[in-house]
Regions:
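Glycine-centered tight-turn motifs at strand-turn-strand junctions
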Residues: 477-504, 516-520
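Short, glycine-anchored, charge-dense loop/turn motifs used at functional sites
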Residues: 468-478, 509
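Short coil-to-beta transitions that initiate beta-strands within beta-rich domains
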Residues: 33-61, 85-102, 111-113, 118-121, ...
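Glycine-centered coil/turn sites that cap beta-strands in beta-rich domains
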Residues: 432-469
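C-terminal tail/sorting-segment detector
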Residues: 508-528
């Protein structure tokens, strides 16, 4: 399996901002101190489960599931979680941008967000590579040039090239390892598409057609510039965003200027692009590529976005389906911003901004799920309008990464288990960041417009009915609702409304959970 997840955009999206650990705050990132030297030689159990509730990257293979942004993994269907001990990722500003798992080889592309001139710039931070199934990881530097790398030999031509010498705008948005020959491919936006034949120790540029050509071949002389940027000499088609080596060994490279195919290992290329017809790309920005292998030859599914460079049908969000090596192209889910794909035989799962889409007829018709309910508790749901960023199917289990947790289904999407970062009420070792509490609320502060509801966590000794009261700063009751709880830890939700259905004003609110003889109290800060 290769990368599973959203590829955050240079222009629009910053999924993995740095977050500190504070009890009851908006993000949960908890763990022991890091190792040194950038290498990992130990596995650390995560007592709090997954370490972030926004799951943008996901890979499941042979019963193991790996999730971002901190390389959590589980071998028992999410019952317990671990992470590698590495100071290149955990406890730093770095986050997982891409991951590919092929048997015992795990390649993780990491990046961060730098602030330059008041703007957040996504930045390459290198790679973590394991060849022993994740027991240890080695660090590799980002895929950059030296100042002297201002030309590129391509067949009979020596082309002018722009040296990419800084890591800003070159994060590893996608990565794919080819177990057949050991080649490693990365899509790094401003650094383009690159290949390594020595497990990331060195990298070479991959030359794609410029914006004014749809075919290139090494025996033909050219004079275009290899320049992954906008501008008179630059090419959108040199700005790499996704890459896939399919089971036949064909190389597919998605860029901001189209989808490129090589049948000779990445030398000669043919470019597909949107032309306004239904037999072309929906949009020229290819942010994700996945292979459906139950067809012969395989079918390639592309998340094709509007680049903003052209309008009309050629610039729509949607899914482009390429069959028979690209000789047959059709479109689906027009208007949907799609991030990822997974397959179970003929069933197709698509992760999108508006939910999870499921097709059993090769994308001609779709069912969709926009809100997920936990089968263990009727009151446990994902937030309305949560985005679905990533999806994977492995050994009968459907894994879905959302902006509000990791989801697992054992029955192909009919019922769900919701997994969140699980900060305990009574930790085995209490600390300032994870204190011993009878109750807490999250996210806190709470914004109804952004969060939809706040979750109140508490523990009941028995199954019974109770009430939760919300008070304003003057201790006036603004909301009361009944709860039916199970023995153990429970979560209830408040939508930020008063008893008249009117959103409450900004300020501090207090809550009281009444469960028979037990009462738990906490505070919620509402900021809209």
């Amino acid at each position: 399996m290769r990368i599973k997840g959203i590829k955050s955009t240079i222009f629009l999206l910053c999924m993995f901002a740095t977050a500190s650990v504070t009890f009851g705050q908006r993000a949960f990132l908890v763990g022991p101190p890091q190792s040194s030297l950038g290498n990992s030689n130990a596995l650390i159990e995560s007592p709090y489960g997954i370490l972030n509730n926004s799951i943008a990257n996901l890979d499941a293979n042979n019963g193991l599931v790996w999730v971002g942004p901190y390389l959590n993994f589980s071998s028992n269907q999410g019952a317990s979680w671990y992470r590698p001990e590495t100071d290149s990722l955990f406890g730093t500003v770095n986050r997982l941008f891409s991951i590919d798992v092929e048997d015992d080889v795990i390649v993780a592309g990491i990046g961060r967000n730098d602030v330059v001139g008041g703007q957040s710039i996504q930045t390459a931070a290198g790679f973590l590579i394991s060849e022993d199934g994740g027991l240890s990881f080695q660090y590799r530097f980002p895929q950059l040039d030296g100042p002297e790398d201002d030309t590129q030999v391509y067949g009979v031509s020596t082309l002018p090239a722009l040296p990419v010498i800084v890591p800003q705008q070159s994060p590893p948005f996608d990565i794919d390892y080819n177990p057949t020959n050991g080649d490693l491919w990365v899509a790094g936006w401003a650094s383009g598409i690159r290949k390594s034949s020595d497990m990331g120790r060195t990298w070479s540029r991959v030359v794609l057609p410029p914006d004014n050509l749809d075919l290139i071949s090494p025996e033909i002389p050219y004079s275009f510039s290899v320049e992954p940027q906008r501008g008179s000499n630059g090419s959108l088609n040199h700005m790499g965003f996704s890459v896939l080596v399919d089971k036949q060994g064909l190389i597919w490279a998605g860029t901001a200027g189209g989808l490129n195919l090589s049948i000779d290992g990445g030398v000669a290329w043919r470019r597909f692009k949107g032309d306004g017809t239904s037999q072309s790309l929906t949009g020229n920005w290819i942010i994700s590529l996945e292979e459906q292998t139950n067809t012969s030859p395989s079918t390639i599914w592309a998340a094709s976005w509007n680049t903003g460079e052209s309008g009309g049908a050629a610039g729509q969000y949607g899914v482009t389906i390429l069959e028979n090596g690209g000789s047959s192209i059709r479109q689906s889910l027009l208007g949907e911003k799609v991030f990822d794909f997974a397959f179970n035989g003929t069933t197709v799962y698509v992760a999108g901004d508006n939910g999870l889409f499921i097709s059993k007829d090769a994308g001609r018709t779709w069912d969709s799920i926009s809100q997920f309910k936990d089968s263990r508790s009727s009151g446990r749901v994902t937030r309305p309008h949560s985005s679905v960023f990533s999806v994977e199917y492995d050994q009968g289990i459907l894994w879905v990464g959302t902006s509000d947790g990791l989801l697992r289904s054992d029955d192909e999407g009919r019922t769900w288990t919701i997994l969140h970062a699980n900060i305990p009420l009574h930790p085995a070792q209490a600390s300032n960041s994870v204190p011993n509490k009878n109750t807490y609320a999250y996210p806190n502060p709470f914004s109804r417009g952004e969060d939809s509801f706040v979750r109140i966590k508490y523990e009941a000794s028995d199954a019974l009915s109770g009430t939760i009261n919300i008070f304003d700063f003057g201790m006036n009751v603004v909301r009361e609702f009944r709860v039916d709880v199970q023995a153990g830890v429970n979560e209830s939700m408040w939508d930020g409304m008063d008893m008249s259905g009117i959103p409450v004003s900004n300020g501090a609110y207090f809550y009281e959970v009444n469960l028979g003889k037990s009462r738990f109290r906490g505070k919620i800060l509402v900021i809209e």
